[in-house]
């Protein structure tokens, strides 16, 4: 593996364990790869325990348990118990589907610290349509059970063109449920969301109206419910510091053991991300070519190389650059300084046109195989 000067590198602090790609829902904005149904076997319980131990020894302290739907793993409580023994702060990121009071109590006993529940819409018909599964009533029960079992209620609603008109109702639903935290996560366009972008990207006017409603409501519930509004990249003129900088803070392990600097990095060609089945976490973090590829600033092209903002945003998202320009070393096209910024503007302009002539692809194994066969 390619080497790096260890003394100059930070250690991973946040480990995202994508335990499985299995999921009973079929959300068309899912960030999982399009070809997920063709990927290899999931890591075993013992393999996950080894990964958690190695990452913790290296410095990781926050553990996200996601998927797919992590509740489909019957060994979830065992993994949580091991994480707790290692000293992680554990966060279950779930649709809530498959969670009941018995399982919540089991996870609580195992030492789980935090549960984040996603809801697609405050209205049953749209929620179940977007999820591809009748799940709305159960999600509401789960949200209440979570709080009854002593957890803070953390709701996440992914925002897009299909539900952005419901912003006021989303906020009222969260308030009525007694949510302690509400994350309004505007869709980021990777994986299935990019495939369905023409159906999902709101217009500029829709976004501005929804943001104003959210900001106003934030003042109304100040001290009672914290609202986090994640602005979509496409409506910024400067990119975010993706993952706080490539290979500096975040480490994702996919269900088949592939180690990723960010959860979408699997889409980058020629990156050759290593597997935890072949290398230790220490080797992957310090030695792998994939994790060293976009560290520091030497890889940058203009306009990033001479930009005074490069130490703030690190050139933006490598995956977004590749998906929109074909070159993962290009400046993130979200940036107004990028020579490819017009591609973001074109995507926004396309929201004014009807997307009815294009199918909406739901995230399921049949579509995964058909699209990548």
Curated annotation (Swiss-Prot):
SMART domains: Elp3. One of its GO terms (molecular function) is iron ion binding. It catalyses: [PQQ precursor protein] + S-adenosyl-L-methionine = E-Y cross-linked-[PQQ precursor protein] + 5'-deoxyadenosine + L-methionine + H(+). It holds the Pfam family Fer4_12. It is an enzyme of class 1 (oxidoreductase). One of its GO terms (biological process) is pyrroloquinoline quinone biosynthetic process. Disulfide bonds: none annotated. Binds 1 [4Fe-4S] cluster. The cluster is coordinated with 3 cysteines and an exchangeable S-adenosyl-L-methionine. Its EC number is 1.21.98.4. [4Fe-4S] cluster binds at residues 23, 27, 30. The keyword Iron applies. Keywords: 4Fe-4S, Iron, Iron-sulfur, Metal-binding, Oxidoreductase, PQQ biosynthesis, S-adenosyl-L-methionine. Gene3D superfamilies: Aldolase class I (3.20.20.70). The keyword Transmembrane helix does not apply. Its cofactor is [4Fe-4S] cluster. InterPro entries: 4Fe4S-binding_SPASM_dom (IPR023885), Aldolase_TIM (IPR013785), Elp3/MiaA/NifB-like_rSAM (IPR006638), MoaA_NifB_PqqE_Fe-S-bd_CS (IPR000385), PQQ_synth_PqqE_bac (IPR011843), PqqE-like (IPR017200), Radical_SAM_PqqE_MftC-like (IPR050377), rSAM (IPR007197). Pathway: Cofactor biosynthesis; pyrroloquinoline quinone biosynthesis. CDD domains: Radical_SAM, SPASM_PqqE. Residues 9-224 form the Radical SAM core domain. Interacts with PqqD. The interaction is necessary for activity of PqqE. HAMAP family: PqqE. Catalyzes the cross-linking of a glutamate residue and a tyrosine residue in the PqqA protein as part of the biosynthesis of pyrroloquinoline quinone (PQQ). Belongs to the radical SAM superfamily. PqqE family. This is PqqA peptide cyclase. It comes from Methylococcus capsulatus (strain ATCC 33009 / NCIMB 11132 / Bath). The lineage of its organism: Bacteria, Pseudomonadati, Pseudomonadota, Gammaproteobacteria, Methylococcales.
């Amino acid at each position: 593996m390619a080497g790096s000067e260890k003394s100059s590198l930070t250690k991973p602090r946040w480990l995202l364990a994508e335990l499985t790609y299995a999921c009973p829902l079929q959300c068309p904005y899912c960030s999982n790869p399009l070809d997920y149904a063709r990927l290899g076997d999931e890591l075993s319980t013992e393999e996950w325990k080894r990964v958690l131990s190695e990452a913790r020894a290296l410095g990781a302290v926050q553990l996200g348990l996601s998927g797919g739907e992590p509740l489909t793993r019957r060994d979830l409580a065992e993994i949580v118990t091991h994480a707790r023994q290692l000293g992680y702060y554990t966060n279950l990121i779930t649709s809530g589907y498959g969670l009941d009071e018995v399982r919540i109590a089991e996870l609580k006993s195992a030492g789980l610290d935090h549960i984040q529940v996603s809801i697609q819409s405050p209205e049953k018909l749209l929620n179940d349509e977007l999820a591809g599964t009748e799940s709305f009533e159960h999600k509401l029960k789960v949200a209440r059970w979570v709080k009854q079992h002593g957890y803070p209620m953390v709701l996440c609603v992914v925002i897009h063109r299909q539900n952005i008109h419901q912003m006021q109702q989303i906020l009222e639903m969260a308030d009525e449920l007694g949510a302690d935290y509400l994350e309004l996560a505007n869709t980021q366009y990777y994986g299935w969301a990019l495939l369905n972008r023409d159906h999902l990207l709101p217009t500029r006017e829709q976004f501005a109206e929804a943001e104003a409603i959210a900001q106003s409501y934030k003042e109304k519930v100040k001290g009672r419910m914290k609202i986090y509004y994640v602005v979509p990249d496409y409506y910024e003129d400067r990119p975010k510091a993706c993952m706080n900088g490539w290979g500096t803070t975040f480490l994702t392990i996919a269900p088949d053991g592939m180690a990723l600097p960010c959860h979408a990095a699997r889409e980058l060609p020629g990156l050759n991300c290593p597997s935890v089945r072949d290398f230790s976490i220490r080797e992957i973090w310090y030695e792998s070519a994939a994790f060293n590829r976009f560290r520091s600033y030497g890889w940058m092209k203009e306009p990033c190389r001479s930009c005074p903002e490069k130490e703030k945003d690190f050139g933006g998202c490598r995956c977004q650059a590749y998906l929109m320009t074909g070159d993962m070393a290009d400046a993130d096209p979200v940036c107004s300084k990028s020579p490819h910024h017009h591609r973001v503007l074109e995507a926004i302009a396309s929201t004014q046109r009807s997307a009815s002539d294009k199918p909406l692809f739901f995230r399921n194994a049949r579509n995964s195989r058909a699209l990548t066969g």
